[in-house]
C-alpha cells in the first residue's frame, strides 16, 4: 500500500510489473516448500506444484525484465538472439520433460528429485528472460498484462498446492482479469 501511494501515476506500469514478479516468486516458493515437504506426494499436488514452479519462475524473471525496460535500467530495444526460436523451443521441451520427471519420478534423468526441481527453476527463470527480452519497450504494457495473467495462474495453482480455496479463486480472478486486459491491449496494436 505504501509503495503504491508513493509512486507517480506515470510509473504505475513498473510497479505492476514488480507486483507481478513478487506474485510469481511467492507462488514458486510455495511450490518449492510443498515439494520439499515429504507429506505432499499426491499425484494432483505434484501436478499443481510443477505448474506453480513453471509459471511462477517465468512470471518472476519476465516481470523483472519488463520492470527494467520500463524504468530504463535495461535498454528498451528488443534483444533478438541468433537461433532464439530454437533455443526457446528446446528450453520449453526440456522444462516439460523435467515437469514429467517431477510428477512421475521415473529416474530416467539419473538425477535426484531435488536436483530436477532446482534445474527446472533455473530453466523457468531463463525462459522468463528470453521470452520478455525480445519485446520492445513500447509493447511492455501488453507484456505486463500477460504476466499479470501468469501471476494469477501461478497463485491459483499455489492455492491447489496448499488446498486454499480463497487463493484458488483470487488467483483465477487475477488470471482472468489479466487475460482480458492482455486481449484488449493486444487488440489495440495495429
Model-derived segments and spans:
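Hydrophobic core segments of alpha-helical transmembrane domains in multi-pass membrane transport
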Residues: 1-2, 55-63, 90-101, 121-130, ...
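C-terminal ends of transmembrane helices
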Residues: 1-13, 63-78, 127-137
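Transmembrane alpha-helix boundary signature
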Residues: 2-11, 30-41, 106
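Cytoplasmic-side transmembrane-helix entry/capping segments in multi-pass membrane proteins
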Residues: 11-22, 78-88, 141-148
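Transmembrane helix-loop junctions at the membrane interface of multipass transporters and ion channels
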Residues: 33-41, 142, 150-169
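Alpha-helical transmembrane segments
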Residues: 45-57, 171-176
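Structural signature of hydrophobic alpha-helical transmembrane segments
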Residues: 49-57, 113-122
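Conserved small/polar residues in nucleotide/adenosyl-binding loops
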Residues: 182-190
Amino acid at each position: 500500500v505504501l509503495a503504491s501511494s508513493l509512486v507517480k501515476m506515470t510509473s504505475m506500469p513498473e510497479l505492476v510489473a514488480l507486483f507481478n514478479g513478487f506474485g510469481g516468486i511467492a507462488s514458486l516458493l510455495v511450490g518449492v516448500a510443498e515439494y520439499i515437504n515429504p507429506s505432499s506426494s499426491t499425484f494432483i499436488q505434484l501436478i499443481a506444484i510443477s505448474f506453480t514452479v513453471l509459471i511462477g519462475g517465468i512470471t518472476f524473471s519476465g516481470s523483472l525484465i519488463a520492470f527494467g525496460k520500463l524504468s530504463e535500467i535495461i535498454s528498451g530495444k528488443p534483444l533478438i538472439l541468433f537461433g532464439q526460436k530454437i533455443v526457446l523451443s528446446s528450453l520449453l521441451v526440456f522444462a516439460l520433460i523435467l515437469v514429467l520427471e517431477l510428477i512421475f519420478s521415473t529416474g530416467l534423468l539419473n538425477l535426484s528429485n531435488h536436483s530436477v526441481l532446482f534445474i527446472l527453476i533455473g530453466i523457468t527463470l531463463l525462459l522468463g528472460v528470453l521470452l520478455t527480452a525480445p519485446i520492445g519497450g513500447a509493447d511492455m504494457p501488453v507484456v505486463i498484462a500477460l504476466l499479470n495473467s501468469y501471476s494469477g495462474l501461478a497463485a491459483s495453482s499455489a492455492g491447489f498446492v496448499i488446498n486454499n480455496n480463497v487463493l484458488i479463486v483470487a488467483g483465477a480472478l487475477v488470471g482472468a482479469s489479466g487475460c482480458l486486459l492482455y486481449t484488449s491491449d493486444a487488440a489495440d496494436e495495429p
